[in-house]
């Protein structure tokens, strides 16, 4: 047991050996739920984030136990490499979930090759990093990997994110906790346009893959918003609003890396 930077504490009731011992019993769901509750109690950054519904009757406890056995019997790593392995496993499952969801999956997951390209271009070595449509937090994870590859100090960055979907907001919190990255995602999920969680933030790096061509984004309620420094965005398309929102939160001499639909800079759609 120890305390260190960017480490969350795993209490006795949440430790892997206790979960494994119960994996083939009918009580495995109760044990996993208790583990989640214990983790949240000891780690304030996880409070209200972890799922605690594994004891529900409709969940097949044998299948849950089999999944635990797969991890126990096939993933072997030391403490020093555990975080990296768990992070890659989590990223793999996020990618699989996104593929299963099809187009909808793109709302919470950006392919790692796209994220790596953005990170390599803007090079977020140190400073404040912001993603106003952060999904599951992939931009931040790749930023931390970039810093590690270049022998930088992860403690020299501050991470800020916002996500509209409450379930995806929780995924991002878990993703960054697993990877040992401290982050400020606001006190809840929220709409970046109508409920800006970081209204005074000026970030050194802004990275995002916001949803394309959103037509119903409530632009008619924000016509006098101070973020629209380059003109009022069309009410029928949020692309220009996303760009201005990011520019508004960009510090002097900051850098932006974003993914938007073709023609976002020239389209008259929605005017």
Question: What spans do the regions from the language model cover?
Answer:
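Non-catalytic, mostly N-terminal accessory regions of nucleic-acid modification and defense proteins
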Residues: 1-125, 184-197
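Short amphipathic alpha-helical segments, especially helix-boundary/capping motifs
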Residues: 41-47, 63-67, 90-95, 147-152, ...
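Helical mechanochemical/support elements of P-loop NTPase systems and associated helical scaffolds
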Residues: 63, 85, 89, 110, ...
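Conserved S-adenosyl-L-methionine
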Residues: 104-208, 213-217, 222-224, 229, ...
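Conserved Class I SAM-dependent methyltransferase catalytic core
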Residues: 118, 169, 187, 234-271
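Phosphate-binding glycine-rich loops and adjacent basic patches that engage nucleotide phosphates
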Residues: 26-34, 46-56, 75-84, 130-138, ...
């Amino acid at each position: 047991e120890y305390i260190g930077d960017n480490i969350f504490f795993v209490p006795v009731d949440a430790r892997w050996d206790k979960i494994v011992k119960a994996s083939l019993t009918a009580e495995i769901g109760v044990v996993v739920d208790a583990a989640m509750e214990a983790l949240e109690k000891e780690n304030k950054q996880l409070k209200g984030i972890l799922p605690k519904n594994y004891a529900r009757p409709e969940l097949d406890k044998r299948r849950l136990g089999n999944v635990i056995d797969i991890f126990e019997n096939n993933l072997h790593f030391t403490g020093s490499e555990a975080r990296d392995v768990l992070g890659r496993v989590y990223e793999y499952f996020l990618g699989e979930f996104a593929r299963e969801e099809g187009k909808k999956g793109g709302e919470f997951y950006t392919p790692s090759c796209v994220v790596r390209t953005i990170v390599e271009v803007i090079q977020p070595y140190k400073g404040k990093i912001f993603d106003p449509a952060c999904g599951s937090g992939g931009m931040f994870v790749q930023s931390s990997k970039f810093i590690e590859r270049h022998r930088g100090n992860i403690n020299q960055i501050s991470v800020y994110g916002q996500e509209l979907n409450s379930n995806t907001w929780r995924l991002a919190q878990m993703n960054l906790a697993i990877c040992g990255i401290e982050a400020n995602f606001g006190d809840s999920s929220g709409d970046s346009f109508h409920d800006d969680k970081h209204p005074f933030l000026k970030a050194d790096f802004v990275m995002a893959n916001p949803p394309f061509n959103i037509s119903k984004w409530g632009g008619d309620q924000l016509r006098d918003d101070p973020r629209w420094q380059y003109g009022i965005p069309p009410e029928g398309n949020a692309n220009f609003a996303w760009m201005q929102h990011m520019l508004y939160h960009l510090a002097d001499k900051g850098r932006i890396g974003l993914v938007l639909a073709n023609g976002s800079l020239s389209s008259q759609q929605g005017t």
